[in-house]
């Protein structure tokens, strides 16, 4: 191949030795040509010539005498590229589609032996001389079997994930045991929290009071540490950590041995609240002891379920709603905040699977417009999976009571980070409404709703919720692996709601650093228990 530019600059000639491109001339009037035009021409040719060279070489190697240059070009690059399909190919495609349509409605014979792999299918075709229809039928049966196996594997994966999410990791169990032992042997671990001179602060409304109910010591440490480190006024922070009787010693030890000064921490067990008696919480006592309820949360999660008509996502939601934590008193405590803290006017209630990234003190300045609950709504937002929750997502609207009292299109709101006006709350019947609907659902054998503790709260707080800006509380980090990282960085609170908690191995690796940032890996108890190693 040669490129020749005439001395007069009137023509550019391209020629090839094999006559694939015999001659190409670009003629230009001398008086109109400019160096810029020439430069652009040569630049275009620099991109074009390698392609022409390769194409010429291919044609030469394949044999240029067997076809014309353009015909070879079309044949080598494929008829579809040039939009040409010969009649025989069209007939073959039509016949194959016809066979597929016939086979799609045909019954697959019982006992049909299916190949284990595609290579075995090809081998069987050769050995048994399959016609096209037999091949299509066997191939369809193979695909359907593969789909069934894949579906069963997906449900098995979801079940295993459910059990993993409900279990206690070895490291966290170790941490609780070691801290409990420390409480019994170390007087400093038993020191009063807070110190006696700071006790009046626990009921002082000039401070910012946070309530955290959890039996997870590691999670509690992250919530408290992230709040203190993100605050512009840590000296104004008071944390009321509520736990159960078995975790109390370990929880107390942690905060006694790991000060978050100047913030103040109080640790109490549910058995230390005089108000929490069986007389005041009879419904929850019934929920915890009712056999059908216990079987629902602890029994066989697949028995009675029609998996053929259930999508994996729906099944995952049902499994999440059957977490044993939903029959724990700790998970219902927020409904009793006005009684548990009779001297406080406002509190922020936090779940233990959140991380605080910004100063939350402005929450106390938000005007709730006479409402009780400041919360982020979950029916609108960029993430349509996480932020598309309406009442229809939580309730069974085929139940007459639900259909009568609720609107399926009403926007839902989120637990996890809520600002509660306790003074206004005490003037309402929210607690009584909550108990009443719990009783109704218990009577109906859990046919009104099945997803945890939020549904009765959605009813009880109806008309008492003030929406707050969504930037205060970002949800979904425990089940949405495609969480927008930039939005997560900007959110005041990020919430790992869902099964993939950051302290579990099933947590999302790329979302875990937001949480581990506040884990004190230099702590001896953390190191000795090999947390998240």
UniProtKB/Swiss-Prot annotation:
Enumerate the glycosylated residues. 306, 396, 445, 520
Q: Which GO terms describe its cellular component?
A: Golgi apparatus; Golgi membrane; pollen tube
Topology of this chain in the membrane: Single-pass type II membrane protein
InterPro entries documented for this protein:
GAUT, Glyco_trans_8, Nucleotide-diphossugar_trans
Q: Transmembrane stretches, by residue range?
A: 41-61
What GO biological process terms does the UniProt entry carry, in alphabetical order?
A: cell wall pectin biosynthetic process; pollen development; pollen tube growth
Query: Which segments sit on the Cytoplasmic face?
Result: 1-40
The record's statement on gene disruption is: The pollen tube growth defects of plants lacking TOD1 are partially suppressed by gaut13 mutation. The gaut13 gaut14 double mutant is defective in male gametophyte function; swollen pollen tubes disturbed in elongation, and characterized by a disorganized outer layer cell wall with an altered repartition of pectin (e.g. homogalacturonan).
Q: In which tissues is it expressed?
A: Expressed in roots, inflorescences, siliques, leaves and stems. Accumulates in pollen grains.
**Annotated CDD domains:** GT8_like_1
Q: Name one Pfam family in it.
A: Glyco_transf_8
Q: What is the annotated role of this protein in its UniProt record?
A: May be involved in pectin and/or xylans biosynthesis in cell walls. Together with GAUT14, required for pollen tube growth, possibly through the regulation of pectin biosynthesis and repartition in the pollen tube wall.
What is the name attached to this protein's record?
Probable galacturonosyltransferase 13
Task: Name the gene.
Answer: GAUT13
């Amino acid at each position: 191949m040669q490129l020749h530019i005439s001395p007069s600059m009137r023509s550019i000639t391209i020629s090839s030795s094999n006559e694939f491109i015999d001659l190409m001339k670009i003629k230009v009037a001398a008086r109109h040509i400019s160096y810029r035009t020439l430069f652009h021409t040569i630049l275009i040719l620099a991109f074009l010539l390698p392609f022409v060279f390769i194409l010429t070489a291919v044609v030469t190697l394949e044999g240029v005498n067997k076809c014309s240059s353009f015909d070879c070009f079309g044949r080598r690059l494929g008829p579809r590229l040039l939009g040409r399909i010969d009649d025989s190919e069209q007939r073959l495609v039509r016949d194959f589609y016809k066979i597929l349509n016939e086979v799609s409605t045909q019954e697959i014979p019982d006992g049909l032996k299916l190949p284990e792999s595609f290579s075995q299918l090809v081998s069987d075709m050769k050995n048994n001389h399959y016609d096209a229809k037999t091949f299509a039928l066997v191939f369809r049966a193979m695909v359907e079997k593969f789909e069934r196996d894949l579906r069963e594997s997906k449900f098995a994966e979801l079940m295993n994930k459910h059990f993993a999410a409900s279990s206690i990791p070895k490291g966290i169990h170790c941490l609780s045991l070691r801290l409990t032992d420390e409480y019994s042997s170390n007087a400093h671990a038993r020191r009063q929290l807070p110190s006696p001179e700071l006790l009046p602060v626990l009921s002082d409304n000039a401070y910012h009071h946070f309530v955290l109910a959890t039996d997870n010591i590691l999670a509690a440490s992250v919530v408290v540490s992230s709040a203190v480190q993100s605050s512009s006024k840590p000296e104004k922070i008071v944390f009321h950590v509520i736990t159960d009787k078995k975790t109390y010693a370990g929880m107390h030890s942690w905060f006694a041995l790991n000060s978050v000064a100047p913030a103040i921490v109080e640790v109490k067990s549910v058995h230390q609240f005089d108000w929490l008696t069986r007389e005041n919480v009879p419904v929850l006592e019934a929920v915890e002891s009712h056999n059908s309820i216990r079987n629902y949360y602890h029994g066989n999660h697949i028995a009675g379920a029609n998996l053929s008509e259930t999508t994996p996502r729906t099944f995952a939601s049902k499994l999440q709603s059957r977490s044993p934590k939903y029959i724990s008193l700790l998970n219902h405590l927020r409904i009793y905040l006005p009684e548990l803290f009779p001297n406080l006017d406002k509190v922020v209630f936090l779940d233990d699977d959140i991380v605080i990234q910004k100063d939350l003190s402005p929450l106390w300045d938000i005007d709730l417009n006479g409402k009780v609950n400041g919360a982020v709504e979950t029916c609108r937002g960029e993430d349509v999976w996480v932020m598309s929750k309406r009442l229809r997502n939580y309730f069974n609207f085929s139940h007459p009571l639900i259909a009568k009292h609720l609107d399926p299109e009403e926007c839902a709101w989120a637990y996890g980070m809520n600002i509660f006006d306790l003074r206004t709350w005490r003037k309402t019947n929210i607690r009584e409404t909550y108990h009443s609907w719990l009783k109704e659902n218990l009577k109906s054998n859990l046919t009104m709703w099945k997803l945890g503790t939020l549904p009765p709260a959605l009813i009880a707080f109806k008309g008492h919720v003030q929406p707050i800006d969504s930037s205060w509380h970002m949800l979904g980090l425990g089940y949405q692996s495609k969480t927008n990282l930039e939005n997560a960085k900007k959110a005041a609170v990020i919430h790992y709601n869902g099964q993939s908690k950051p302290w579990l191995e099933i947590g999302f690796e790329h979302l875990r650093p937001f949480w581990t940032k506040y884990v004190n890996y230099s702590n001896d108890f953390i190191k000795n228990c090999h947390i998240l190693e």
